[in-house]
Curated annotation (Swiss-Prot):
Similarity field: Belongs to the RNase PH family.
HAMAP family recorded: RNase_PH
Protein name as annotated: Ribonuclease PH
Function recorded in the entry: Phosphorolytic 3'-5' exoribonuclease that plays an important role in tRNA 3'-end maturation. Removes nucleotide residues following the 3'-CCA terminus of tRNAs; can also add nucleotides to the ends of RNA molecules by using nucleoside diphosphates as substrates, but this may not be physiologically important. Probably plays a role in initiation of 16S rRNA degradation (leading to ribosome degradation) during starvation.
NCBIfam families in UniProt: RNasePH
Pfam family, one: RNase_PH_C
EC number: 2.7.7.56
Catalysis: reaction(s): tRNA(n+1) + phosphate = tRNA(n) + a ribonucleoside 5'-diphosphate
Catalytic class of the enzyme: transferase
Gene: rph
Binding site residues for phosphate: R86, G124, T125, R126
Molecular function in Gene Ontology: 3'-5'-RNA exonuclease activity; tRNA binding; tRNA nucleotidyltransferase activity
Length: 235
């Protein structure tokens, strides 16, 4: 039995609230159960040095947690003077995932930055950030079209992410914190609306996992992610 009384293949309640803040070109509050993340998309003219003159855009991300997003206060990374390895890893994951949504050439030499701020953490913050940022980014691109910064809305491939893992010997979908801390295996899966995998990150925590368990976890992701993409489209 899962702590939340969910079935092994059941997502937490997921909501996506668009236009959550006033100033960003795209803004979303995404909620996976008690995990809540604000995802703001900002358009900035120009691209990183390695892309200058190539007439294509760039998509990048920043990620952070508020001090009381967790059960006890966590010191802000800014006060420490540097970002931690976990934060850098998550930022890169979000950026890679979102760059799979569109052909970067349609952006011209513009950069979209996704700021993902966790206001409450109960497991799956990075997967929630990816899922919410996809919607925020689409709204930001629509903003670019409205202001004639690009000619037309490009083909947009929705991307979503979910956690899967082995909890008490059973593969489960969308782990909350109570499950995550006891999971024998923890995996994050990113897929697009065609059902193709973009990224799979899996780690054995206490016990190694076999091919059958791996397949079971991927199958659970294939159940959950289409549901998330449907929620994205209906937001």
């Amino acid at each position: 039995m899962r702590p939340s009384n969910r079935e092994h293949d059941q997502l937490r309640p997921v909501t996506i609230t668009r236009n959550f803040t006033n100033y960003a070109e795209g803004s979303v509050l995404v909620e996976f159960g008690q995990t809540k993340v604000i995802c703001n998309a900002s358009i900035v003219e120009g691209v990183p040095r390695f892309l200058k003159g190539k007439n294509q855009g760039w998509i990048t991300a920043e990620y952070g947690m508020l001090p009381r997003a967790t059960h006890s206060r966590t010191e802000r990374e800014a006060s420490k003077g540097k970002q931690g390895g976990r934060t850098l890893e998550i930022q890169r994951l979000i950026g890679r995932s979102l760059r799979a949504c569109i052909d970067l050439k349609v952006l011209g030499e513009n950069t979209i930055t996704l700021d993902c701020d966790v206001i409450q953490a109960d497991g799956g913050t990075r997967t929630a950030a990816i899922t919410g940022s996809c919607v925020a980014m689409r709204d930001a691109i629509h903003w670019m079209v409205q202001r004639e910064k690009i000619k037309k809305m490009p083909v947009f491939n929705y991307v979503a992410a979910v956690s899967v893992g082995i909890y008490r010997g059973q593969p489960v979908l969308d782990l909350d914190y109570a499950e995550d801390v006891l999971a024998e295996t923890d995996m994050n899966v990113v897929m697009n609306e065609q059902g193709h995998f973009i990224e799979v990150q899996g780690t054995a925590e206490d016990n190694s996992f076999n091919r059958e368990q791996l397949n079971s976890m991927l199958s659970l992701a294939e159940i959950g992610i289409p549901q998330l993409i449907e929620i994205q489209k209906n937001a």
